[in-house]
Amino acid sequence: MSSGIGSLVKVIFKNFDVIAGPVISLVYPLYASVRAIESRSHGDDKQWLTYWALYSLIKLFELTFFRLLEWIPLYPYAKLALTSWLVLPGMNGAAYLYEHYVRSFLLSPHTVNVWYVPAKKDDDLGATAGKFTPVNDSGAPQEKIVSSVDTSAKYVGHSAFDDAYIY
């Protein structure tokens, strides 16, 4: 009988992250979120909204880098510790992490298009176009770049939808 209990304890310790992870990261926050919705206080609403936003970021990170994270042996335990810090009411980890890192990143202005170079105010379209006007051997601008387009040539090939096409 004692070997059965010992085996059970061994299995629980080996799979602690699998057992405790969903309870700590989903079940308790869900319960606390429902209680926060039903309460009149807005402080707990902010705590749990912040938690769910951070939990979503963690899950997106995991989904993106799953192949890399599966090679890190202690990642499940580190995630469990981080999630516990975010969830536990006395620590307010979610509020701290959001206020000090995520909020400052989201509210700071970001450069979206780093390759955009604005035109100068004194640029003249004619002067700019003159820089790229083709010139002939004497240095004078050419009259016409393309004189005419020959439209007399017809496509002689067949398509797969023609009746005369041989397969």
UniProtKB/Swiss-Prot annotation:
Predominantly expressed in flower buds. It is found in: Membrane. It comes from the Eukaryota. Its main location: membrane. Keywords: Membrane, Stress response, Transmembrane, Transmembrane helix. The chain crosses the membrane at residues 18-38, 47-67, 68-88. The keyword Transmembrane helix applies. GO terms for cellular component: membrane. Induction: By abscisic acid (ABA) and salt stresses. InterPro entries: TB2_DP1_HVA22. It is a multi-pass membrane protein. GO terms for biological process: hyperosmotic salinity response; response to abscisic acid. Belongs to the DP1 family. This is HVA22-like protein b. It comes from Arabidopsis thaliana.
